Amino acid sequence: MKVIFAGTPDFAAAALKAVAAAGFEIPLVLTQPDRPKGRGMQLTAPPVKQAALELGLRVEQPEKLRNNAEALQMLKEVEADVMVVAAYGLILPQEVLDTPKHGCLNIHASLLPRWRGAAPIQRAIEAGDAETGVCIMQMDIGLDTGDVVSEHRYAIQPTDTANEVHDALMEIGAAAVVADLQQLQSKGRLNAVKQPEEGVTYAQKLSKEEARIDWSKSAAVIERKIRAFNPVPAAWVEYQGKPMKIRRAEVVAQQGAAGEVLSCSADGLVVACGENALKITELQPAGGRRMNIAAFAAGRHIEAGTKL
């Protein structure tokens, strides 16, 4: 069975490796163009391209698929049975969706229809969801509105960051899409069910500005945001006129004026919130490295009563 693979980041690269390891023929891999990255802004290949080259697969990097006759012709010439799409980042027009014999399967990191859109992992943690998961979806022209082929649940742990949930769902998604491809190969079809009309939510892209901590919120809400926005864009506060990223914190039953430092020690930097307080245990000063609060407190002291 011929499988075209389209994806860009690590989440997708894991799935590509799994599909290849399962023995499926992959005549074409699509990924986004190389982009400048890092402090040196060096042109860097996306993880899917790196994985594809290691596997000896053909890689193409079109800037767009919409209104791109050359790319469409390339896809048609492959005569693929199905396309697997994972965090590709380009819009697939209807003519692309229709090109493979069995259409396009998307690996989406939420329990649809909850958290359609760009940042499902982060929004699930931020909202305090007890669980999330992966859906393998038969793509249509809408935003994550296609019929669901399979659903795989994951219980969000109380200390899970977005990075940790991402890594768990990356492995779940890779195994899930392989299982569905194997079913398609053996049975010639997949049983997909329509998404419920109730419970639709949208996971908007994250912004740096919304990552700024609002101390008038409850400590529980802020703690979830810190985990949801870890590692990027990272929840932050202004300290000495510069943004300081907050990496880890926990809720403590203390009270004070919102944004007021209650104590600073090797055990934690405690800041009052709208309800309860937050004990910060890991942070990252502007231009510095991530550090635990003991290392931070050894070189700096924030007086009780300071406003953040």
Curated annotation (Swiss-Prot):
Keywords, alphabetical: Protein biosynthesis, Transferase
Catalytic activities: L-methionyl-tRNA(fMet) + (6R)-10-formyltetrahydrofolate = N-formyl-L-methionyl-tRNA(fMet) + (6S)-5,6,7,8-tetrahydrofolate + H(+)
One MF term in the entry's GO annotations: methionyl-tRNA formyltransferase activity
InterPro entries to which the protein is assigned, alphabetical: Fmt (IPR005794), Formyl_trans_C (IPR005793), Formyl_transf_N (IPR002376), Formyl_transf_N_sf (IPR036477), Formyl_transferase-like_C_sf (IPR011034), GART_AS (IPR001555), Met-tRNA-FMT_C (IPR044135), Met-tRNA-FMT_N (IPR041711)
Keyword Transferase: yes
GO CC field: cytosol
Keyword Protein biosynthesis listed: yes
E.C. numbers: 2.1.2.9
PROSITE patterns in the cross-refs: GART (PS00373)
Binding positions ((6S)-5,6,7,8-tetrahydrofolate): S110, L111, L112, P113
Superkingdom, natural source: Bacteria
Function comment: Attaches a formyl group to the free amino group of methionyl-tRNA(fMet). The formyl group appears to play a dual role in the initiator identity of N-formylmethionyl-tRNA by promoting its recognition by IF2 and preventing the misappropriation of this tRNA by the elongation apparatus.
Similarity comment: Belongs to the Fmt family.
The protein's name: Methionyl-tRNA formyltransferase
Source organism of this protein record: Neisseria meningitidis serogroup A / serotype 4A (strain DSM 15465 / Z2491)
Taxonomic classification: Bacteria, Pseudomonadati, Pseudomonadota, Betaproteobacteria, Neisseriales
Gene coding for it: fmt
